[in-house]
């Protein structure tokens, strides 16, 4: 006995380079299930897509057209798959990724603004610049604490769905704002590749889309 998989998924990390694919599918009459699929198998195709951010992840579009897999390829025969938990855990990972990128934005822009001199003084002496840096630090701390809380509750075996969602929501909304503010603080330099803030801005924009629409 086996299964036939049919479907298509975008934004698959390393989808064109992976040696094995982990595929989540909805089985007729059974519910969600997970399978390990060989990407070289007949019916499996992948196309690397040029996204504006997260390019090192080699995000790809993977298509499965009547792919036949054996029953042994199905994971968790003894324990039903908790797909919602998998999604919630991935939300925590996405939030943590955003926290790291936002920390890089803060560190870089703070040093730049302290060294950038205009009208005889560092631009951090201007209230508008100092306030923007302070706002980035405040929002980043909020992102980090929500992510820590969600991860801690998950590790302790406590309910964490709400916490994971809030961490993802904060990371997506505030992450994009921090990326935008980082570019803004550098002015014209924020739009050239000599400075990394343009890369982080693109990455944060892409991170906000990894988990799909925020209300989901």
Predicted regions and their residues:
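Acidic-glycine-rich active-site phosphate/pyrophosphate-binding loop
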Residues: 72-81, 194
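A short core secondary-structure module
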Residues: 8-47
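Flexible, small-/acidic-enriched active-site or ligand-binding loops
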Residues: 12, 38-74
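Residue-level signal for inorganic ion chemistry
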Residues: 7, 35, 64, 102, ...
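A generic structural signal for well-ordered coil/turn residues at beta-strand boundaries
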Residues: 17-19, 30-31, 40, 56-63, ...
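Conserved hydrophobic/aromatic beta-strand scaffold that supports enzyme active sites
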Residues: 2, 20-24, 34-36, 59-66
């Amino acid at each position: 006995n086996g299964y036939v998989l049919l479907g298509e998924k975008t934004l698959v990390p390393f989808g064109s380079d992976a040696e094995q694919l982990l595929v989540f599918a909805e089985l007729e009459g059974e519910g969600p299930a997970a399978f390990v699929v060989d990407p070289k198998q007949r019916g499996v195709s992948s196309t690397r897509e040029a996204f504006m951010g997260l390019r090192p992840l080699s995000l790809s579009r993977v298509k499965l057209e009547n792919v036949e897999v054996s029953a042994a390829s199905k994971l968790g025969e003894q324990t039903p798959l908790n797909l919602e938990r998998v999604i919630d855990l991935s939300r925590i990972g996405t939030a943590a990724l955003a926290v790291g990128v936002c920390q890089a934005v803060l560190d870089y822009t703070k040093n730049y603004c302290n060294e950038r001199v205009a009208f005889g003084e560092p631009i951090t002496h201007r209230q508008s610049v100092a306030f923007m840096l302070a706002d980035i630090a405040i929002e980043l701390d909020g992102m980090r604490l929500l992510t820590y809380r969600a991860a801690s509750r998950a590790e302790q075996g406590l309910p964490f769905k709400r916490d994971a969602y809030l961490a993802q929501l904060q990371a997506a909304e505030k992450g994009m704002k921090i990326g935008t503010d980082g570019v803004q603080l550098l002015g014209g330099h924020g739009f050239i590749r000599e400075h990394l803030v343009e890369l982080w801005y693109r990455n944060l924009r892409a991170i906000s889309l990894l988990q799909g629409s925020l209300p989901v």
